[in-house]
């Protein structure tokens, strides 16, 4: 078997995609600050402003292949009340959304928990950890873009 010819070596460390970059911006403190940031950075542009719980609930009713259509024509995303996701199925759907947002390079503004806490510690250490770390990395990059807009 081919796999018997190789040794798996795990290399942990800083995400190379974020080396030399400023720290991820903190979530905005409240809805009023979110509204002001949307107006300041994205006035006159198409911004989807959603409650995080309503968003993840909606994702459960839409097939992931349709997530691209959900964000079609948008210039930015704003989420109110981002929280830690504690259900694996919900988290995996959210990963797909994060990938679609990253593919479209859509800046994200948010309130609630920072994106590095959107998945539980157990998820970040479990079988899908690569997916979760990728999603956190991508969401962080998109939050930086919004902060710089």
Predicted regions and their residues:
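Residues that form generic nucleotide/phosphate-binding pockets
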Residues: 5, 70, 138, 142
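Interdomain motor-coupling "hinge/lid" segment immediately C-terminal to the ATP-binding subdomain
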Residues: 1-47
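Charged, low-complexity surface segments at secondary-structure and domain boundaries
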Residues: 22-27, 55, 120-124
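Conserved helicase/translocase motor-coupling segment
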Residues: 39-103
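Alpha-helical structural motif
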Residues: 34, 66, 70, 131-135
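Residue-level detector of flexible, active-site-proximal loop/helix-junction positions
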Residues: 15, 56, 146
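Terminal-proximal interaction/regulatory segments of ATP-powered molecular machines
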Residues: 76-149
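Short glycine-/polar-rich loops that comprise or flank the Walker A/P-loop
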Residues: 2-7, 73-75, 104-106
